[in-house]
């Protein structure tokens, strides 16, 4: 009987679906929550870093640490990690290669790239009739200054940025002009977005598999205008209006994400600011008790049956 049980146990382990979770920080809250949610749905989570990935072309091997990436049934991209231009290109190449091998990659490399590139996402929002603030992206100092004059007050962001890092709010005055020139000289390119007067908060909406999972207000700390939770913002429960629901679902659909965090600002109307293709689930869990990672894990389970 004992031998039979061992055989059954080994069979169960061998047939359990293996789900890779790409993280940078192994202690990341969302990464750990994804592991628990994957286990909850009877699958095996395998945490790895794309920053440690290796491809041996003659041998036909692709692995990260001790994990054979080609043996996975699916990959959830929680984080690509900081990287150089060559490095990030290689990481996307790996994800594309896994897709070609028939391994489900969530979110898809294409949708992650669209979401990560603020220029591309802003362009796609406008192209598809989604309200988004006026935006100018340019290598030209004169064009940048002209945009600042037009907007009066603007937000300057890195095209590829996260967690509110490197974001500046500038006015059309001497200080703002100097800051804009400084950013242009430093980066060679500026992404300038019209500042939308708002109630001191934005809305983060979580969408999974074309369904609204939950939403929170992200409220800027006193003395700041940046709402990101990683920059000291506070999460509070939010009930969406029908228009905000429509905007969120449309934005996710246009970018092509399976799961995402859509950021909306309340001004004279609702605007989609940007979309996060690798959002944290911590804020909405602490504010509302919503476990976004369970929705993601359930989608993965159903998609690889």
Q: Which sequence ranges carry the predicted segments?
A:
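N-terminal amphipathic/basic-hydrophobic helices that include classical n-h-c signal peptides
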Residues: 1-15
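Active-site nucleotide/adenylate-binding loops and adjacent lid/helix of ATP-dependent enzymes
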Residues: 17-24, 34-36, 45, 95-96, ...
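C-terminal active-site "lid" helix and adjoining low-complexity regulatory extension at the edge
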Residues: 253, 257, 266-305
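Phosphate-binding site of ATP-dependent enzymes
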Residues: 165-255
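Protein kinase-like catalytic core scaffold
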Residues: 154, 191, 213-214, 260, ...
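Short glycine-rich anion-binding loops that position phosphate/pyrophosphate groups of nucleotides
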Residues: 80-82, 160-161, 278
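Short, surface-exposed charged micro-motifs
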Residues: 204, 261-263
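Conserved N-proximal alpha/beta basic substrate-recognition cap immediately N-terminal to
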Residues: 25-132
